[in-house]
Amino acid sequence: MMKIELAVNGTLMRGLALNHNLLELGAVFVEESITAPCYRLWSINDQYPAMQRCSKGGQISLEIWRIDPSNIGELLGREPAGLSVGKILLADNRQVLGILGESYLCEGKREITQFGGWRKYKESSESEGSNFRSDSALTSNKNRS
């Protein structure tokens, strides 16, 4: 059965709250990677990130997973409104499908591009003792990426 590569950059990553959504659909971890330096990342209410391509941005850490293309719709159905699947350019010039955020979702939200990824943002937020919601608070909610 043919599988495709899918880049994820938020709570779907290994060890995070919604990674089980990938595992339940038979996805297999391939590698850690980073985007080309043309992406921006926002925190959506400290619950999940939204990434967008732009002309000038930064490199964002992500994970590449192999998944059956027939399961993409199911996975996307578990994601919140405003997240979708699109093409992502990696630092090594490969292009893969991945989770992206629509512009309306990011309006008025905190930009976290400077952290280089969701994990680093989360670690920084927790070490600062902020009101960051932990992934355990999201475990029961299947509607976040």
Please annotate each region the language model reported.
Residues M2-N141, S145:
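Glycine-aromatic micro-motifs
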